[in-house]
Amino acid sequence: MEEKEEGKIRINKYLSDAGVCSRREADRQIAAGNVRIGDAVARIGDLVMPDMPIYYQGRLVEAEEEPILLVVNKPKGIVCTAQKKEKDNIVDFLHYPKRIYPIGRLDKQSEGLILMTNKGDFVNKIMRSGNRHEKEYLVTVHKTASDSFLRALAEGVPILDTMTRKCRVERIGKRSFRMVLTQGMNRQIRRMCEYFDYRVVSLKRVRIMNIRLGDLPTGAYRKVTPEELKRLEQLLENSSNDTVRFDSSAIDQQLWEEEE
């Protein structure tokens, strides 16, 4: 139970809610003596009020920000990274007035739905493949997609020294089909198709869990609706969130696996 006194929360949750790091990483930093509450060194399990001065690795933690969760229709050619050294990074492309990060990735030549947020819990819970959250894609290949090919995709394909999970595959055209995955491996869909000598010529993500791209124009973004956010939080309620560290220096290394 997070709240033991009215208005107070555990310090690891405070740091996670502020977008500083995951709760597990917060506990590590607290144990290492890198978190202070005012002038006092914090201890694991300490309770804090939102207006208390909290210092993380010597820096004052800003007051909790209003949660931001954006639905973005990423164009081809944009890279899902927060690193400024990448000239086509999605943060500069979007030019949003507040600090946000992409949740997962789509490779540079793919397009469609990417979520962006300032909340560490969203990143951690959606990213963790063990939570088996659904992601839906529209795929077009370079030649006629045979029925046997589509069935084989659905049953699982050996790539990257493992067998992909079974997934849903539905034909929508002679060369196009819909795929619903519950995992995210590096260039997963492209590798799965290449295994059967099919080349992906178009890949578009249209859904993450209950969030749909809909008719959002390419390159545009919108905030999730209150109804979408409520349902998303319900779906994430029992999800683990302690495997991905949420910080700008490590985010590209941590999010590699979601590149379809």
Where are these regions (language model features)?
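Basic, flexible Lys/Arg- and Gly-enriched helix-loop patches that mediate nucleic-acid binding at interfaces
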Residues: 2-260
